[in-house]
Amino acid sequence: MTTVLVTGGAGFIATHTDIELLNKGYDVISVDNYGNSSPVALERVEQITGKPVKRYDGDVRDEALMERVFAENNIDWVIHFAGLKAVGESVAKPIEYYDNNLYSTLVLLKVMKKHNVKKIIFSSSATVYGTPKELPITEETPTGGTTNPYGTSKLFQEQILRDVHVADPSWTIVLLRYFNPVGAHESGLLGEDPKGIPANLTPYVAKVAVGELKEVQVYGDDYDTPDGTGVRDYIHVVDLAKGHVAVIDHIDKEGVFVYNLGTGHGYSVLEVIKAYEKAAGHPIPYAIKPRRPGDIAACYADASKAEKELGWKAELTIDDMAASSLNWQTKNPNGFRDAE
């Protein structure tokens, strides 16, 4: 039986990945401090799959805790999701972002090395490409020139992982660069549950659609894009989750492997709002605001390498993303808090 340690295992992308792993017959162990998530999410994973998740409640930066996790379990793979993830907040709180994101990775790698566990999938991001010179973005597109500490922290973590492989080529390191994960589990039991006002577009649009917030804030309508609003490659979180399972199923050799996980198609902010209007059956009010610091005009993937090497491709559409996200929001207006 393959055992997978999922750091930040109660998070948005992680819980959807937990489900795909459990459904494939893998054992899942979660370490999470619930800084931006809820233990209820793991209960929902168990409810959906009918299988247990072994929980360790705590911080990946706690070396004694991580030592215990590795001593008590026979871990085959690690998927490292744990970290802070809001672009705007990272600009305001760079020290916290570097401390949390880099230190957690260093502690994790130190303990993995000690216990001779050398297979890791790292939850990276398209932000490592900075402002891309050309689109679509391939895995060969230069990285660097990141526009915010969140993206820079992901780039630094990628470099740390590459250096670990240089020092010891017996490691298997997979860098998955996510584009913009959205949507929710079809059951309506799991979805994105940001604490406070959502920093990401789609949970914000969903809250406006159900009348919880007044209007969508559209940051900038003067970008060099077809309708002036920012264009991103939105990918359904369930497709993204399946990408992680595809890695474990397909990669059985040492090395550093890099994959973009996106749909290959960019949608503007206004197109996303239209998809939510279609799902909700009514107009969604929005207001144009100034651009946000650290944002870029457009970003979308060429994900053909993942299809060729992992047999993976995104299958769900922007309409699926909007409908599932609204279903989650309608059934859980307060996220997981009602069940806590």
UniProtKB/Swiss-Prot annotation:
Alphabetically, the GO molecular function entries are:
UDP-glucose 4-epimerase activity
Biological or metabolic pathway of the protein: Carbohydrate metabolism; galactose metabolism
Instruction: List the keywords (alphabetical).
Output: Carbohydrate metabolism, Galactose metabolism, Isomerase, NAD
Q: Name one GO biological process term.
A: galactose metabolic process
Q: Which family does it belong to?
A: Belongs to the NAD(P)-dependent epimerase/dehydratase family.
Function summary: Involved in the metabolism of galactose. Catalyzes the conversion of UDP-galactose (UDP-Gal) to UDP-glucose (UDP-Glc) through a mechanism involving the transient reduction of NAD. Can also epimerize UDP-GalNAc to UDP-GlcNAc. Involved in the lacto-N-biose I/galacto-N-biose (LNB/GNB) degradation pathway, which is important for host intestinal colonization by bifidobacteria.
Protein name per the record: UDP-glucose 4-epimerase
Q: Which gene encodes it?
A: lnpD
